[in-house]
């Protein structure tokens, strides 16, 4: 089980990423634009660096919905491998059954 503080930190990161998404995309467009002058690019880089660190989407971590576990996450179900196996063994995941060959 993940600490409550880690789960709360992820919630804050998601909110910050949503808040600064448009600003971040705008600055990145200026930086990657061929038509921008060097000075405009440099100013855009400085502004991008001044944004909060947690506003970057790459800082987010996908976590299990039940436990908050960050490793072994199965995106299709939103669960960690452990909780997915438990749910599958109880028959709670339609169409999923234990493999045997």
Curated annotation (Swiss-Prot):
Entry GO terms, CC: cytoplasm; small ribosomal subunit
PROSITE patterns found in the cross-reference section: RIBOSOMAL_S14
Residues in coiled coil: none
InterPro entries: Ribosomal_uS14, Ribosomal_uS14_bac/plastid, Ribosomal_uS14_CS
Sample GO molecular function, one term: structural constituent of ribosome
Pfam entry (one): Ribosomal_S14
Annotated spans, Disordered: 50-70
Any single GO BP term: translation
Keywords: Ribonucleoprotein, Ribosomal protein, RNA-binding, rRNA-binding
Superkingdom of the source species: Bacteria
Basic residues composition bias: residue spans: 59-68
Family under the similarity heading: Belongs to the universal ribosomal protein uS14 family.
Subunit structure: Part of the 30S ribosomal subunit. Contacts proteins S3 and S10.
Cited function: Binds 16S rRNA, required for the assembly of 30S particles and may also be responsible for determining the conformation of the 16S rRNA at the A site.
Protein name: Small ribosomal subunit protein uS14
Species the sequence originates in: Erwinia tasmaniensis (strain DSM 17950 / CFBP 7177 / CIP 109463 / NCPPB 4357 / Et1/99)
Gene name linked to the record: rpsN
């Amino acid at each position: 089980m993940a600490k409550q503080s880690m789960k709360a930190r992820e919630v804050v990161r998601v909110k910050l990423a949503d808040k600064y998404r448009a600003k971040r995309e705008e600055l990145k467009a200026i930086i990657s634009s061929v038509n921008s002058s060097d000075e405009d690019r440099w100013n855009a880089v400085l502004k991008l660096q001044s944004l909060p660190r947690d506003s970057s989407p790459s800082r987010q971590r996908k976590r299990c919905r039940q436990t908050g576990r960050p490793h072994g996450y199965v995106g299709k179900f939103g669960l960690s491998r452990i909780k997915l196996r438990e749910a599958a063994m109880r028959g709670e995941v339609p169409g999923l059954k234990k493999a045997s060959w």
